[in-house]
């Protein structure tokens, strides 16, 4: 461009020289201006450019740029001019100016065709751009390219004449997208500073590795203060995000904050978010989004979280119960209330003071006064605890003095502690006995509520807990019908005991033939429960153990009442007579009283009132029917007495009339033993014993008599019983057939005859001086001499077998003791395998039964 000085002293451009980059100097042509105050016309510019470009300026780098396939930054000369013009695109055909449009003029040449373009951009710059199309441009469609993808651009700026024209290269960059705000910065430097502050390059690379969490904050419109711009919101949002993420950093203190629960507003979202973030968001919503307020909130939150951490570091939380001992002793420990209040309990409280504390939970004032809350707990700690875990030695001492209750969990859980203890205590006294001792009315009445509370379950019987009590029930668990008790009334009339005189011994039966030996007819013989004596007369709480042993002595009852027994046999009991009481009117009782009365008799609760009245009337009649008062039995205990009375009747066929001291006038007829008990006890057949000598019989009659009840089951349950004596053998003068037809009678001593298992009645002085059979068995085994070898094989003695832990056959040892062992030591009594088993178990001797013990008897026959 050439400059000329005008008359008024201003400089103007007289010509414009176009400079094409990467071209030879000859390519630059000058455009003469018609007037110093006007720019060249578009037509002249187009004509000049078309002629200059048709000459083919050298562009060696065009093909290279195209082959590289990358965006090339163009450097353009800037032409300055003093006149400011609007953006114009000058067309070469009509010379019309249209704003915002581009016009291209195409000049065709055989080998080198170019396109020239003039574009006036804001800032009074003229852009002269030349493009060369490809060789196959005619065949391909021309596509419009964006500004950033143009090959070459020439920027020209028209400035005043006094300014110098400067050619400066400029690197084009894509303008960054700023904030969508109404006010944009006027200079590009401010935008560059904003871009540098955002650090988009680092953010892009960081985004490839990690995607930040989605911002779920609730926008809050602050109507009080001026709303900040969107740029300020974005900057403050970035700072708040960094603050939130900083809460996840490890603080170096192990422990959880006491107030980790945050009480958010009811309108807060229900999404799962970290508790710390919820707390910070609530503070941000309240205080706003300004930088100064956000910094103060951060300081408050840090100070609030630092205080409870120090408190929790000093007082760590208690460890959970993780051991068996901790679980066992948990119910004895004193529960201490925690220092931190539960937010739910605080919100539900009606006190206004507590509601004020709830509003201050989000700030540090919550932990400002923990001392007042701690004082309440320290006062409780000073009080002595109700239960405390004692050392093991003291625990063992306390365990020794503790009364233990044994039973299944259902029994211990359903029963009351006091009643259960009384029942267990009463049951332990009569556990070794088979007879039933009814409880008093007071005790039965006290236990009635616990019995009725079980509902449909089994009734907790007030009688002894034995198998015969359970056998008195049907398959549904109900007590046997009462009619079975009344079936036996026909043979136990008052006239039998009162009006009939004593009959001479040896009277034969007229109408009924007894069954064979060892059998009992249950169809024709049924026992009626004896009339009950008042329970307080039988059982008292102050009885000594020696007295309790004599409580279960009952009279052997006959199983068949025939003409002989009705005419000649009678039973007299030494207990005093009771006056007959008036029959109470049970219909006037209430239902609860009737239930107590029924429970007092040991029956299951009955729902019907009429059935209870009928049952009580029958029970009262049975008690007061006879003048002789004898104990009343329940159906289960009645079966027990039948069984045990028949078990002990091995005495009957083998006793001689003169073998028992005649100190009483009471006579009892013979009772047939049970068939099943005969098998288990092995009652010897009299015909086999008929070969015994009179000398042995005379010697046996001098020893005191006792009833023996020993079988396999009885020996298992009673380990502390005294060995009984051997049943007596009959004399030669009496044949077995005569004994079957003639009921033997014998005189009883003043005390009732004992039917207890393995016990000898203390009626004579001779039985007290006799040593126990256990010591006699030991003496007999040790007194056995050595045996001679048989066929070169040594025969060990019983003592040597025991020392070598050889299994001892109980039947063989019992036979040896009865034949050879007791004769060496002068013992006249005999033992059964059941008693030998008890001795073996007490001495720790290995003993076994024979394989055929179900066929053979427990008490085998012993030859004299």
UniProtKB/Swiss-Prot annotation:
Residues 58-72 have a biased composition (Basic and acidic residues). Phosphorylated in response to DNA damage. GO terms for molecular function: 5'-flap endonuclease activity. Residues 307-317 have a biased composition (Basic residues). Keywords: DNA damage, DNA recombination, DNA repair, Nucleus, Phosphoprotein. Residues 160-169, 289-306, 659-668, 743-771 have a biased composition (Polar residues). One of its GO terms (biological process) is DNA recombination. Transmembrane segments: none annotated. InterPro entries: Slx4_ascomycetes, Structure-sp_endonuc_su_Slx4. Residues 35-72, 89-113, 160-193, 288-318, 348-382, 413-432, 625-771 are annotated as: Disordered. It holds the Pfam family Slx4. Residues 35-54, 683-695 have a biased composition (Low complexity). The keyword Iron does not apply. Regulatory subunit of the SLX1-SLX4 structure-specific endonuclease that resolves DNA secondary structures generated during DNA repair and recombination. Has endonuclease activity towards branched DNA substrates, introducing single-strand cuts in duplex DNA close to junctions with ss-DNA. Forms a heterodimer with SLX1. Belongs to the SLX4 family. This is Structure-specific endonuclease subunit SLX4. It comes from Paracoccidioides brasiliensis (strain Pb03).
């Amino acid at each position: 461009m050439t400059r000329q000085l005008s008359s008024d002293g201003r400089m103007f451009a007289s010509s414009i020289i176009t400079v094409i980059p990467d071209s030879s100097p000859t390519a630059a042509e000058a455009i003469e201006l018609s007037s110093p105050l006007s720019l060249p016309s578009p037509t002249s510019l187009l004509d000049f450019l078309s002629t200059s470009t048709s000459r083919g300026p050298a562009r060696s780098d065009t093909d290279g740029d195209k082959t590289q396939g990358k965006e090339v930054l163009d450097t353009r000369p800037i032409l300055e001019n003093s006149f400011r013009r609007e953006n114009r695109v000058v067309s070469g055909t009509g010379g019309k100016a249209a704003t915002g449009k581009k016009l291209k003029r195409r000049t065709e040449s055989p080998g080198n065709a170019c396109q020239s373009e003039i574009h006036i951009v804001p800032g009074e710059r003229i852009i002269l751009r030349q493009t060369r199309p490809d060789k196959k441009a005619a065949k391909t469609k021309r596509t419009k390219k964006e500004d950033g993808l143009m090959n070459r651009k020439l920027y020209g700026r028209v400035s005043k004449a006094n300014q110098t024209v400067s050619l400066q290269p400029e690197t084009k960059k894509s303008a960054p997208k700023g904030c969508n705000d109404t006010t944009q910065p006027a200079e590009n430097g401010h935008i560059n500073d904003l871009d540098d502050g955002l650090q988009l390059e680092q953010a892009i690379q960081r985004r490839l590795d990690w995607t930040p969490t989605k911002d779920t904050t609730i926008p809050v419109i602050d109507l009080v203060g001026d709303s900040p711009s969107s740029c300020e919101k974005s900057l403050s949002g970035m700072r708040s995000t960094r603050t939130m993420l900083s809460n996840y950093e490890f603080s170096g203190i192990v422990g959880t904050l006491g107030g980790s629960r945050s009480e958010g507003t009811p309108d807060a979202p229900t999404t799962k978010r970290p508790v710390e973030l919820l707390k910070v968001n609530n503070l941000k919503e309240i205080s706003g989004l300004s930088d100064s307020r956000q910094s103060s909130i951060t300081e408050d939150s840090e100070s609030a979280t630092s205080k409870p951490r120090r408190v929790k570091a000093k007082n760590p939380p208690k460890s959970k119960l993780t051991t068996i001992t901790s679980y066992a002793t948990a119910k004895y420990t004193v529960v201490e209330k925690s220092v931190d209040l539960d937010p739910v309990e605080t919100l539900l409280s009606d006190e206004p003071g507590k509601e004020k504390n709830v509003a201050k939970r989000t700030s540090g004032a919550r932990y400002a006064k923990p001392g007042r809350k701690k004082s309440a707990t320290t006062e409780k700690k000073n009080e002595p605890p109700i239960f405390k875990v004692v050392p093991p030695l003291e625990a063992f001492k306390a365990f020794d003095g503790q009364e233990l209750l044994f039973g299944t969990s259902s029994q211990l859980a359903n029963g009351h502690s006091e009643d259960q203890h009384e029942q267990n205590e009463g049951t332990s006294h009569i556990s070794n006995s088979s007879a039933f001792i009814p409880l008093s009315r007071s005790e039965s009445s006290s236990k009635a509520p616990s019995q009725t509370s079980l509902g449909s379950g089994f009734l907790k019987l007030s009688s002894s807990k034995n198998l015969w009590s359970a056998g008195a029930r049907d398959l549904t668990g109900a007590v046997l019908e009462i009619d079975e008790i009344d079936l036996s009334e026909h043979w136990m009339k008052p006239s039998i005991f009162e009006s009939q005189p004593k009959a001479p011994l040896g009277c034969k039966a007229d109408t009924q033939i007894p069954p064979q030996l060892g059998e009992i007819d249950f169809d024709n013989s049924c026992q009626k429960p004896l009339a009950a004596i008042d329970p307080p007369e039988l059982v008292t709480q102050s009885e000594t153990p020696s007295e309790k042993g004599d409580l279960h002595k009952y009279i052997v009852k006959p199983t068949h009442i025939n003409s002989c027994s009705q005419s000649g046999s009678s039973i007299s009991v030494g207990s005093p007579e009771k006056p007959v009481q008036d029959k109470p009117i049970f219909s006037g009782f209430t239902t609860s009283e009737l239930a107590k009365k029924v429970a007092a008799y040991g029956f299951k609760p009955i729902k019907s009132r009429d059935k209870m009245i009928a049952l009580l009337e029958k029970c009262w009649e049975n008690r007061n029917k006879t003048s002789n008062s004898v104990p009343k039995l329940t159906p289960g205990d009645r079966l027990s007495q039948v069984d045990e009375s028949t078990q002990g009747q091995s005495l009957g066929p083998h006793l001689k009339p003169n073998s028992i001291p005649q100190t009483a006038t009471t006579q009892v007829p013979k009772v047939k033993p049970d068939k099943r008990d005969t098998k288990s006890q092995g009652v010897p057949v009299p015909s086999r014993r008929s070969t015994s000598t009179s000398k042995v019989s005379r010697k046996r009659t001098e020893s005191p008599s006792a009833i023996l009840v020993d079988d396999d089951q009885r020996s298992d349950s009673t380990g502390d019983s005294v060995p009984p004596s051997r049943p007596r053998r009959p004399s030669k003068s009496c044949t077995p057939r005569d004994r079957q037809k003639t009921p033997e009678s014998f005189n009883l001593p003043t005390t009732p005859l004992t039917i207890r298992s393995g016990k000898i009645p203390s009626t004579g002085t001779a039985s007290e001086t006799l040593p126990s059979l256990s010591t006699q068995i030991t003496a007999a085994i040790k007194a056995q001499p050595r045996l001679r070898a048989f066929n070169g094989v040594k025969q060990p003695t019983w003592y040597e077998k025991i020392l070598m832990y050889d299994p001892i056959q109980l039947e063989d040892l019992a036979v040896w003791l009865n034949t050879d062992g007791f004769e060496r030591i002068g013992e006249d009594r005999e033992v059964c395998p059941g008693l030998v088993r008890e001795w073996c178990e007490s001495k720790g001797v290995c003993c076994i039964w024979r394989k055929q013990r179900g066929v053979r008897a427990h008490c085998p026959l012993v030859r004299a």
